[in-house]
Swiss-Prot record:
Glycosylation site residues: 70
Function: Mediates both low-affinity uptake and efflux of sugar across the plasma membrane.
Protein name: Bidirectional sugar transporter SWEET3b
Domain (MtN3/slv) ranges: 10-98, 134-219
Assembly mode: Forms homooligomers and/or heterooligomers.
UniProt topological domain (Cytoplasmic) ranges: 30-43, 97-105, 154-167, 212-252
Gene: SWEET3B
InterPro entries: SWEET (IPR047664), SWEET_rpt (IPR004316)
Molecular-function annotations in GO: sugar transmembrane transporter activity
Organism whose genome encodes this protein: Oryza sativa subsp. japonica
UniProt-listed GO biological process terms: carbohydrate transport
């Protein structure tokens, strides 16, 4: 009874951390909307997150799990579905044509695969145990893919020595969410919840370490950019004062 109470408490904390994780890209997409461009941001993590949320929402429902034993899992992933759909929609709206096509080529198979998973688990397996194994195994692979996708951003950080496209809060909440859900899964002896988070934890730690290493380089680059802009403004202003007119555009 006590262990179940602790598990529920950890699940609630996991829900809170996951909510922050799913909501963290809001800052990124505010920037996308403001600039009217997706810049170098990738949509792959959001598509993989959508697939993961679909699977674990289904996993937590009474169709797969026994009763509402995993209600916290289905509730937070249900919210995740709504947020990921919103992010993917915004990304698609502001993305160039080729990236729009790429998003569609990824999203449609994801939705089709989830539909097949739901149908097969409902009609081919007749016990909760078998359904959990089937859906959980697919969810395990999806979670590993989701937690591995930020490694693309990590590689970019190492290459460019800039954390511009790897937001700090996304890395922090990813680590906290993974740690809490790993504990939740272990307390309930549910390896399909605990296992993927064994991978998510070190991935989150790695991102935080990279952020600590390269954040100074990013700040210094921003300062140099500001100084260059300021110096450019001073040169133009001085030219105007001396000549009494704006500088002519450079000829080809």
């Amino acid at each position: 009874m006590v262990s179940n109470t602790i598990r529920v408490a950890v699940g609630i904390l996991g829900n809170a951390a996951s909510m922050l994780l799913y909501a963290a890209p809001i800052l990124t997409f505010r920037r996308v909307i403001k600039k009217g461009s997706v810049e170098e941001f990738s949509c792959v993590p959001y598509i993989l997150a959508l697939f993961n949320c679909l699977l674990y929402t289904w996993y937590g429902l009474p169709v797969v799990s026994s009763g509402w034993e995993n209600s916290t899992v289905s509730s937070i992933n249900g919210l995740g579905i709504l947020l990921e759909i919103a992010f993917i929609s915004i990304y698609t709206w502001f993305a160039p044509r080729e990236r729009k096509k790429f998003v569609l080529r990824m999203v449609l198979p994801v939705l089709a695969f989830f539909a097949l998973t739901a149908i097969f688990s409902s009609f081919l397996f007749h016990t909760h145990g078998l359904r959990k194994v089937f859906v959980g195994s697919i969810g395990l692979v999806a979670s590993i893919s989701m937690y591995s996708s930020p490694m693309v951003a990590a590689k970019q950080v190492i290459t460019t020595k800039s954390v511009e496209f790897m937001p700090f809060y996304l890395s922090l909440f990813s680590f906290l969410s993974s740690a809490l859900w790993m504990i939740y899964g272990l307390l309930g002896k549910d390896l399909f919840i605990a296992s993927p988070n064994f991978i998510g934890c070190p991935m989150g730690i790695l991102q935080l370490v990279l952020y600590c290493i390269y954040r100074k380089s990013h700040k210094e680059a921003e300062k140099l950019h500001d100084i260059d802009q300021e110096n450019g403004l001073k040169v133009v202003t001085t030219h105007e004062k001396i000549t009494g007119r704006e500088p002519e555009a450079q000829r080809d």
